[in-house]
Amino acid sequence: MKITRLLQSLLLAAWSLAASAAAPPMQVPDTIAQRAAACIACHGREGASTDGGYFPRLSGKPEGYLFNQLRSFRDGRRFNADMTHMVQHLSDAYLRELAAYFAGLDLPYPPTPANTDATPEMLARGQALTFQGDAARGIPACAQCHGQALTGVQPGIPGLLGLPRLYLSSQLGAWLTNDRHALAPDCMAKVGKKLTTADINAVTSWLALQPVPADSHPVAALPGPLPIRCSAMNR
């Protein structure tokens, strides 16, 4: 009886091995969309941002801008522990593939917030800085670099609309305090250091209230030269 059971077990094991050998190897899906899924916990579905109040939108941003920011997190020019952990071992080629994926997405923007604690005077100051700048202090208008529609410029200047006020103010604050950097020439570092906290509160309050235009895509080029040299436009 024991011998019969042993033979049955051996035959069953042999059959299982034969079946495993005959079956094709399981293919594990590995697409850039699946790899980018790690980003959605913070940045929202397909990088379309969340209502969490801080994390920026990724989808539809200029590819060059996204690539530069990923490199900056990897190489220590921008500082965020989670982002650094995510990208610190990734190659330029991998980062460029991620940037191209998110840049190619064309998703609707969420509704623009309707409420603000900013005063009318603050909002007027923010609008003036956005479209006129402050020539006496050497501050160019935001629109001179980010486009008149504020939707960004290819290949490397981001749009300023559809972003949380907290995110905008934290980034301008980081330039003001020398905690954020870019490759030279670092145009935003030069501009950011000239801003006051009142300027930052005003311009970010105004920007956060502006609706995103129907055509939210970055423009191909500015109508004139940049007011300040900027590595963002180095192809």
What would you call each of these model-derived segments?
Residues 23-36, 45-48, 81-88, 92-151, ...:
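Flexible coil segments in periplasmic/lumen-exposed cytochrome c-class electron-transfer proteins
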Residues 1-5:
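Positively charged n-region of N-terminal signal peptides that target proteins for export
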Residues 26-76, 80:
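The feature marks the first
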Residues 70-73, 90, 102, 172:
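Fold-core signature of tandem repeat domains
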Residues 56-59, 88, 159-160, 194:
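Tandem-repeat/low-complexity and Cys-motif detector
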Residues 8-18:
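Bacterial N-terminal signal peptides
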Residues 60-63, 69, 158, 162-164, ...:
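Extracellular/lumenal glycan-associated surfaces
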